[in-house]
Amino acid sequence: MTTSAPPVRDELFGPSRRAVTVGILLLISLIAFEAMGVGTAMPAIVADLASVASYSWPFVAFIAPMVVGTVLGGRWCDARGPRAVLLLAPALFGLGLLVGGTAGTMAQLLVGRVLQGFGAGAQGVAVYVLIALVYSERARPAVFGLVSSAWVLPSLIGPPVSGLVTEHLSWHWVFLGLLPLVLLAVGLVFPAVRGLSVPAPGERGPARRSTVAAAFAAAAG
C-alpha cells in the first residue's frame, strides 16, 4: 500500500514551510518595488534634491549594481551555499534603503541606490537557490509561479502606493517604510536558512547547475 504525496499547497503553506514561503515572496516583492515602484516618487525626489538633470541616474544606480550583485551572489552561493548571502544581502539592501531614505543630496541618494541594487541582485539569486534546496521538485513550479507574481504585483500597485506615500508623507518614506518589511522577511526565512549547510566540493556540481539557473532567473526578473 502506498501513501500519496501531500498536496503542493501543503508543502508551500503548511506549518513547516509557510514562513519561508511568505519570506521569499516578501523579499522578491521588495526588490521589485525598488526596481519599478519608486518611479512615481522620482519627480518629487529630484525636485527636492535640486537635481532634475540627474533624473535617470537613480534608476541606473540601481539596475547596474543589481546585475553585478546577481553575478557575485551566484558565485558565492555556488562556493558557500546561500546561507550567508541570504543574511548579508538583505542587510546591504536595508542599508541602502536607510542611506537613500535619509538623503539630502543626489550623491547620497545614488550611494543608497547602489547599495540597494547590489543587495537586491545578490538577494534575488540566493532566493532562487534557496527554492531549489528547500522545496521538492514537484513543488518548485508552484513556488516559481508565486515568485513571478511577486515580481509583477509591485509593478502594478507599486507606482500608486509610491505616489500616495510621497503625496501624504514624504518621498523619504518610499525607502524608509520598507525597512521593517526587510527585517520581517529575514526573520521569516532565517529558520530555513539556518539549517542549510555549506556544500562540500564533491556536491557542488548539482549546486552549480541550480545556481546558474537561478542567476538567469534572477536576471530575467
Residue ranges and their predicted role:
Residues 2-190:
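Transmembrane-helix bundle of Major Facilitator Superfamily
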Residues 168-221:
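Hydrophobic transmembrane-helix bundles of small-molecule transporters
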